[in-house]
Structure formats: C-alpha cells, structure tokens
Amino acid sequence: MKNKFLAIILVIVVTSLLNAQDFSIARLKYSGGGDWYNDPSAEVNLLKFVQANTNIKVNAEYKFVDIASDEIFSYPFLFLTGHGNIVFSSDEAKRLRTYLESGGFLYIDDDYGLDKAVKREMKKVFPGNDFVEVPFSHKIFSIFYKFDNGIPKTHEHDKKTPQTFGIFLGNRLAVLYTFEANPSDGWADPEVHND
C-alpha cells in the first residue's frame, strides 16, 4: 500500500513520455537548511517496486540534481523532500518554472516541517498559481491502484488528515504535494524507521 500511491504517479508520468530510455527519478537538491538528502533508499525501493509490478523499465539508482543545474531537464520526474526550510533563488525558481512548463513533473513529500517553506517557495516559481487540493475523483487516485479516500497516511506526525495538493498547468498536474501523509518514509529501507 505504501508504494502503490507513487506507482500511480509514475504510471501517469511515464505513459506520457515518448522517450524510450529507462525511467528514473532525480532527488532535487535545494538550499535553505532542509535535509534534501534524507532516506536515500526511498526512490531506489520505489523504482524497484514499479519495475516488479508494471511494464515500466526503470533505472533504480539514487540520483540527485542541484536545482541550479541544467541537469534537471534530463529527468521527467523530480522528487523533493526533507524537514525544515527550503530556499529558491530567483534564478532557481525561474529554472524550475521552465522545467515544469516544459513538461517536467515535481513530486514534493513533506517529511515534516516543510509546509510553510514549500508554499512560500512555490509562489516564487508560480506567483499566479496556488496549490489546490486534488479531488479524490482525480485519475491519480485510480489509474493503477484505487484510493477512494485519497492518499493513505504512511507516517504519523500530528494526527492530521493526509492531504494531496497540486499545481495544475492547464489540465496537467505539474506539481504534486503530499502533506501529513509522508509516503516516502514507507519506501525507505525498513531499518530506517524500524517498521
């Protein structure tokens, strides 16, 4: 169950790609003091799950890219997580906006304590766009596995209801943000969280 939600996201992103290369995810390295590097086994385990349960060919290696680098344009799927603060310079915000407007996808998982920074910094990226709650009727909750009640809670923090937010560019979900759910903790090696 922990991996299924992001498997849905991967299916959506990958099926929209025309490139025949193996699919991979890059962790987005950012400034500001948040631990962008936490749980490095998460993406590798998720990609292995996707490979074992779908027809998607993956490259299950841990990769990270600096937000200031043009290398972000080499990956259709960027992942941002951590605890604490995030800061985008104006150039980084512009680069991320160009990436997303060019068809890239960003998944943000609040591992705890990122909410204010995520909302503040994404306003630099898209000043005219707010995060909106993704309705349970959206295909992301049913394209591969069915989640009638939205994203499941993986890691308990504050006993709040898990929520899924998005920034849409036209009809396309370009940024997905999970809050109070923390599915990436469920992808990490079991010994990381002792569960």
Residues covered by each model-derived region:
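Structured segments of extracytoplasmic/periplasmic soluble domains
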Residues: 49-57, 81, 98-102, 121-129
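An acidic, glycine-rich "communication" segment
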Residues: 21-23, 32-33, 41-42, 115-195
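Aromatic-Pro/Gly-enriched surface loop or interdomain linker
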Residues: 19-77, 81-84, 182-183, 189-195
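Short alpha-beta junction capping motif
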Residues: 25, 77-116
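Sec-dependent N-terminal signal peptides
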Residues: 4-15
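Surface-exposed patches in mature extracellular/periplasmic domains of secreted proteins
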Residues: 56-65, 108-111, 129-136
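Extracellular/periplasmic catalytic domains that process cell-envelope and extracellular macromolecules
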Residues: 20-21, 70-74, 100-101, 166-171
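Alpha-helical scaffolding within the catalytic cores
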Residues: 60-67, 89-95, 159-163
